[in-house]
């Protein structure tokens, strides 16, 4: 990559980070302006268009990055699990670390999931579906259950995890610890339920064939 291309990539990165830094519990992406983001990134507003067509394209890039960040962290969690960690507890801890270190990235996913922009809703739905698919792959490999079971289990788990994540954004350390414990319990219940439901279906199938 040439010097000019490197500089362009650094500026693009600065714009993305500037936009993330301006999000907060009180401020959504929809309230950001091109001028504010450009000023925070240290460039002229007219230079913004060398990197993104408009603010919406910047936002969609941020959604993609947020989803990718989360999936990469959860892959790392699965590597830690392979070395002997508790599957559910390690996954919950990793997810909470993501929220703690990237609260605005998670806020973006939460808000735009049900926002007014169809393009943003579709982008977040796509990222969540990627997350569900990767988890279903892992469950299928580890639990040796059919895809239909692992997809249903993964979807239920992701729904509960995202709901808990929304609560974690606004609580203190002790409340967060309690939420983590509750989430671990809920995920274990889903996991046990999926296993016993599958076993029951297998028993019914065996009886029908007898």
Swiss-Prot record:
What's one GO-annotated cellular component? cytoplasm
Write out the entry's keywords from A to Z.
Cytoplasm, DNA-binding, Fatty acid biosynthesis, Fatty acid metabolism, Lipid biosynthesis, Lipid metabolism, Repressor, Transcription, Transcription regulation
- Entry's PROSITE patterns? HTH_TETR_2 (PS50977)
Role according to the record: Represses the transcription of fabB, involved in unsaturated fatty acid (UFA) biosynthesis. By controlling UFA production, FabR directly influences the physical properties of the membrane bilayer.
SUPFAM superfamilies assigned? Homeodomain-like (SSF46689)
DNA-binding feature ranges:
33-52
Give the GO biological process terms. fatty acid biosynthetic process; negative regulation of fatty acid biosynthetic process
Keyword Transcription listed: yes
What organism does the UniProt record list as the source? Answer: Yersinia enterocolitica serotype O:8 / biotype 1B (strain NCTC 13174 / 8081)
Q: Which GO terms describe its molecular function?
A: DNA binding; DNA-binding transcription factor activity
Q: What is this protein called?
A: HTH-type transcriptional repressor FabR
């Amino acid at each position: 990559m040439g010097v000019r291309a490197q500089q362009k990539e650094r500026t693009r990165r600065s714009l993305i980070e500037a936009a993330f830094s301006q999000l907060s519990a009180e401020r959504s992406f929809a309230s950001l302006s091109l001028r504010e983001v450009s000023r925070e990134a240290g460039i002229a507003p007219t230079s913004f268009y060398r990197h993104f067509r408009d603010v919406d394209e910047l936002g969609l890039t941020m959604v993609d990055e947020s989803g990718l960040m989360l999936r990469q962290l959860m892959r790392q969690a699965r590597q830690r699990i392979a070395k002997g960690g508790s599957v559910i507890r390690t996954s919950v801890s990793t997810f909470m670390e993501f929220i703690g270190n990237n609260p605005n990235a998670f806020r973006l996913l939460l808000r735009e999931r049900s926002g007014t922009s169809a393009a943003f809703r579709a982008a977040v739905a796509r990222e969540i579906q990627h997350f569900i698919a990767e988890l279903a792959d892992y469950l299928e490999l580890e639990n040796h259950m059919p895809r239909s079971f692992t997809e249903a289990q993964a979807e239920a788990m992701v729904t509960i995890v995202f709901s808990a994540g929304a609560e974690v954004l606004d609580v203190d350390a002790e409340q967060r610890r309690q939420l983590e414990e509750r989430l671990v319990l809920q995920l274990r219940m889903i996991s046990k339920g999926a296993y016993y439901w599958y076993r029951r279906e297998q028993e019914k199938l065996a009886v029908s064939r007898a």
